[in-house]
Regions:
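N-terminal "cap/leader" segments of large eukaryotic alpha-helical scaffolds
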Residues: 2-61, 67
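Polar/charged alpha-helical tracts
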Residues: 20-24, 28, 251-262, 266
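Short, highly charged low-complexity linear segments
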Residues: 128-132, 159-164, 226-230, 258-266
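Short inter-helical turns and helix N-cap capping residues of alpha-solenoid HEAT/ARM repeat scaffolds
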Residues: 61-62, 92-93, 124-125, 155-156, ...
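Structural detector for internal amphipathic alpha-helices that build alpha-solenoid repeat scaffolds
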Residues: 24-46, 64-79, 83, 87-90, ...
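A subset of signal/propeptide-processing and intrinsically disordered low-complexity segments
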Residues: 13, 23, 28, 118, ...
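Amphipathic alpha-helical scaffolding segments comprising HEAT/armadillo-like alpha-solenoid repeats
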Residues: 45-59, 78-90, 109-122, 141-153, ...
């Protein structure tokens, strides 16, 4: 188990759910590859509206119904759900809190910013903080940059993983935010002990590159090249190379081709 697999309070027996399985299923639904859905028929607007109506009713029901309602709003957006989701951030059951956090990531609201930030810093459950780290990526205009940086510096691996990804979204609104976000991602790419965090840091740097000033862009390129050549984990090396290729900078692509010709990369 990764080090984010924290014990759950005794109160979780009120829902007959495995928190790890639920967290994984919610993450797959929310974070899956969009290409996987290309062959799937989109539900009609009427079907979505009907499902959201049902979700609102379920949120007002018993514990099992409430979880079903939360799953609906992890998938669909409906502003009517916000007043019913916000109180669930204070639920005693961490599974309910986690699910409400994911639902508010799918249904962003200014009213959710303060309680989400409170959970990121103070919730004692790693699954909940992990969900918050993902959800805050959908709040790029809110004051989430510094809290995400702190999480990337100090929290457990699974929280750092999504903090790195969300920093790319939070920092992608202009140079003023992009530079501090890139600074932390560069540091995490160099020193984080968890390969998945380093991979997401490399991906995030590629996303931020267009919003960075030229000296920082050079540092990003040099760090990604060094990672591509020297990181101990092959997945991190591959992610760094992909990030470099996706910059679509002629000088960077030429440099990569030279490394291929010299046999330093495949």
């Amino acid at each position: 188990m990764p080090d984010d697999a924290l014990p759950f309070p005794r109160g979780t027996h009120e829902l007959a759910l495995d928190p790890e399985v639920l967290a994984r299923e919610l993450a797959e639904e929310l974070l899956g590859d969009p290409l996987d859905d290309l062959d799937t028929a989109e539900p009609s607007a009427g079907d979505v509206a009907a499902e959201c109506d049902l979700g609102l009713e379920l949120l007002a029901g018993d514990a099992e119904q409430r979880m079903q309602g939360l799953r609906i709003f992890c998938e669909h957006r409906d502003p009517r759900a916000i007043p019913r989701l916000l109180p669930l951030l204070q639920a005693s059951c961490p599974i309910v809190r986690m699910s409400a956090v994911y639902a508010l990531g799918r249904n962003p609201s200014p009213l959710a910013v303060e309680p989400l930030l409170g959970l990121l810093t103070a919730d004692d459950n790693g699954y909940v903080r992990k969900a918050v780290a993902w959800s805050l990526g959908n709040y790029p205009d809110a004051p989430v940059l510094n809290p995400l940086i702190r999480s990337l510096q100090f929290d457990v691996a699974a929280v750092r993983l999504w903090a790195a990804s969300s920093l790319a979204d939070a920092g992608g609104t202009g140079p003023a935010k992009a530079d501090p976000a890139a600074s932390q991602l560069l540091l995490s790419l160099r020193i984080d002990s968890e390969p998945a965090v380093r991979s997401n840091s490399a991906w995030g740097l590629g996303r931020l590159y267009p919003d960075l000033v030229e000296p920082r862009q050079r540092e990003v390129v040099e760090t990604l090249v060094h990672t591509m050549l020297h990181d101990a984990d092959s997945a991190v090396r591959d992610e760094a190379r992909l990030a470099l290729e996706q910059l679509e900078q002629p000088d960077v692509l030429e440099r990569l081709q030279t490394l291929v010709d010299e046999g330093l990369i495949g």
